[in-house]
Amino acid sequence: MKEFKVLMFGPQRVGKTSVLSSMLKQFKSETAITDINISLTPDEITKDVVEAKIKDLKEIFDKKASDKSDDRWTIDTNKTPAKEKYRFIMSVAGAADDIGITFTDIPGEWLREQSKKTANGEIDNVTEKELQKELQESSVIIVAIDTPHLMEENGMYHDACNFGGHVNRLIQQSSGEKMCPKLVLFVPLKCEKYYHEGRMDEVNKAVKDKYKMAIASMSKGEKAENYMVAITPIITLGGVVFDDFGRDSEGYVEIITDNAMSFSKPEAAFYKLYDKAPKFAPKFCEQPLLYILKFILDITDFEPPKKASRSFIKEVFKPTKGMKSIYNKIMGKGDKIEIGFEDLLLLNPQILIFGRAMQYVFTPEAQNNIQEAVLKLKVSGSGYEVLQNPFEK
């Protein structure tokens, strides 16, 4: 079974688990009313988490509908204490095998911890090492963004809540290394207020401004050939909107300060029911999964151009018989390949090997089924934008 890893990082309590739960629910709803032959099944542990979360989200509306004593409240009070993994099996009709998709949710504190280095320049921080390992092994990176902290008070509390500087640093570091092709999604969450007010273009612009260093690092020179990048906002609840940060008697935002970590952020964020539609009505939650399918589909057929001479590559890489054997094993399979090993190295080897492997999993029938699903991909409107996709023909 081909394994596919997705890394999610962002602030605690931003609602990453809620999005996964709604993603599964909405994807099942979309496929149930169409002829798309793709299923997504959680393992038993993930299933329990997802079902419990959906129940909790629906109860928000049930409780508030019956209790009018408090018209606003805080949400997402339970933070993830440690790294969590959520596993799904994706089955596509006609595919030679299923695809295992594992979502890894990184605790918010990991992003804030400063990396220390030894005298030899090596990272001396357990969580930093583990985070770097997850970054390298993951094909998809989801940057979850708390939208009220991004937008309110002129974005004053964005860095403290969303770790904007740390996210920029991590992506800049990872994009500087030779890696397999990656899909990077910037996913603003809790967007309901701005969605209902018709301000999603403002959210899009704020994301591009606050994460401009990370975006720039993935779009320069040869690095641009490894990354598909998009902004994909999600309406997590639909009928709940941000109201305001907690304020003192004089109207100033009440903040909490951590001198050790050097940050200050609002002590509380309050939400209220959206009067016009006070019900659980998530939107776009299936889009990250559709983007993953689009990414897989594009990678499967990707053929990048040559960039250097064969003699130069032979001199630099000095291919061994063992390397050629691995190459032949992956690229052969009875196909007539009109490309030599040195030519492979002229291209992006990770992309070609990954794409060729996916071709054996996804037969033409399976690719057609994925293509049907990808037709529902949202690429514009409501703050959506594909910033770059070097793999698309």
What label would you give each PLM region?
Residues T74-S139, H149-M156, A160, G164-R169:
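Switch II of P-loop NTPase G domains
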Residues K2-E3, L7-M8, K28, N259-K276, ...:
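C-terminal non-catalytic interaction/localization modules
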Residues K2, G15, Q136-E137, C180:
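Residue-level preference for short coil/turn positions at secondary-structure junctions
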Residues E137, I141-K333:
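Conserved GTP-binding G-domain of TRAFAC-class P-loop NTPases and closely related GTPase folds
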Residues M1-L111:
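Conserved G1/Walker A P-loop phosphate-binding module
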Residues Q12, E134, A281:
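Aromatic-acidic/polar surface patches that form glycan- and anion
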Residues K5, I99-I101, V140, L183, ...:
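Structural motif
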